[in-house]
């Protein structure tokens, strides 16, 4: 395959996401990457041992939800990008359980290979099967077998000597995690690739990486994490002080409350500060003291707060929908699948406003709705909490049934012959100029799923 239109078509077929864009999205959603929140790891003995010793080829960063694993990996990626020797490649992938494009082992390999080929196109010689199979090579029932074979062969190429491979949130790989862990373990033994992976403290991951991985526990390094969280708190309070014009006394008390209750959890600090952004400075101290320590306690408090709002029922429907669908929805897709949002079909900005007001569970990036963090979805779907019955009163299966019925309704009302008004039925899809607005945009989830 030549470096040409043919190669570019191959990349288009291979691409499930561009991990570089995912990294930018994640950092933007979290308010930017603060150097002081990750710099400690660059002097950590386990990390330095992994980076500097060619015989240490797998490092597992593990920790509880909200401890800053993802931003830690973002910082490590930036450091490796800046310091790696010329010619040494780096590839990474961010798993996301709420998006089926980012939560399978095959998607992980497609993302890693995509980045490697972007840097070293000659590696395409390992993908000869594509010439016969086309894009089905990456999508059919044997996709994992094909991709893992291609990937393993690539790692034996001399141009990938000591390549850095990083995967964030292995616990959010919902499909074929066992096979992915086996591949990581095997290639860390049989090739020179240097793996760095992160996850929660899951027994399954511990068991499969036990014999090959060096561990960097965020709980064991609690003092370093706590210091990083304190730096993060200082940054957030400084921002709030400028935004809300806090006096010195208010800023000091806010900082003290955050430091006393954060328990080394970046996410808790971020969520509390997000609430303070929408609170008048006069009520800042009263507001902050209403937030209990701990993520689940915080989420419980926010559910109670939502229940007292005018649009509570609508927001609960939105949460139930987003918690159930197989991928993140756009604003326009959401308006077609929520009964109370049908009147917002031509006004998705109103839905954006509603979600923004109650932002402790959801966030919006480029008109797509995401959970603020996987722990937020876990909380809502945990039947031990009342939130589950509030957003899914009839259960998950019934919610899928409702989505199915609404999809049938919107498809029957929208689809018609030649909806794009093509002049020639034999037009290539690349030649079709989408109308604005796209009549199929709001029903994309419905016609795919």
Where are these regions (language model features)?
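Amphipathic alpha-helices of TPR/Sel1-like and other helical repeat/solenoid scaffolds
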Residues: 436-449
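Conserved NB-ARC/NACHT P-loop NTPase core of NLR-like innate immune receptors
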Residues: 1-412, 416-437
